Amino acid sequence: MKNNYTSLKSSIDEEGELKTDHEIDLEKGPLPEYDSEEESTLPPYSDHARLSNSPNTHRENNPSRSTDNSSPFLIKLLISFTPIYVLNVLAICYLKYNDAFFKNYGAAEWTLFGFWCLVCTLALIFLTYFYETWTKAVGKGIKHFLKKWENMPMAFSEVFLFNILVGSPRMNLRYIFGDRWGLKWSLAEHITFVVLSILVFIAETVKPGSIRVNLIRKMGYEAKQQVNEYTAVPLREMNPESEA
């Protein structure tokens, strides 16, 4: 009996099988030689090779988003608390020196203490919230300040002269306002005087003579304005013919 077996493959499929051994895919390029003896190598363009060479996932491309942000916040909080801590240490040392640290405190003293704690808390919140802004500003200011180091001796001498001229009125505050009120006024004016001295030192270091020059210019401008007001002549007096 004859076998009437008929192939189900069409002529197009047979032509495709013949072409696969000789034709080159233009997108993938020529196929490299594949060594079947090496178990680690895989035939190119296989599904397993595609999976092994898959691109990085979103988490691998963005590892920073999956990290914890608690540590930077604690660092910001610690750095923001540092200037407040230094200021409080200076105030405590001054009170200890005058033997007035939590001694004989009345209602007024405790009110001032509570107000001071509130100011420190608000300052800590403000410095933590605007951490990037004030740290960048301080960094730029320090760099600009250090570039003017040659002006520091002159600025220091001016601050020293400023302390001598204003020192005697400061010492008389205790005697003018009495022992009890003199302590409060002495502490307030001491802090104010220290801040003013620091500002004068910074201003004279960054721009030498800025305070003196601006003060002299302002006084000269005001004097010139006063002279012009008193010596100004109306237009009618200068041109009497215009009235006729």
UniProtKB/Swiss-Prot annotation:
Keywords: Membrane, Transmembrane, Transmembrane helix, Vacuole. It is a multi-pass membrane protein. Pfam families: WTF. GO terms for cellular component: vacuolar membrane. It is found in: Spore membrane; Vacuole membrane. InterPro entries: WTF. Residues 1-68 are annotated as: Disordered. Residues 17-30 have a biased composition (Basic and acidic residues). Belongs to the WTF family. Homomer. Interacts with other proteins that exhibit high sequence similarity. This is Meiotic drive suppressor wtf2. It comes from Schizosaccharomyces kambucha. The gene is wtf2.
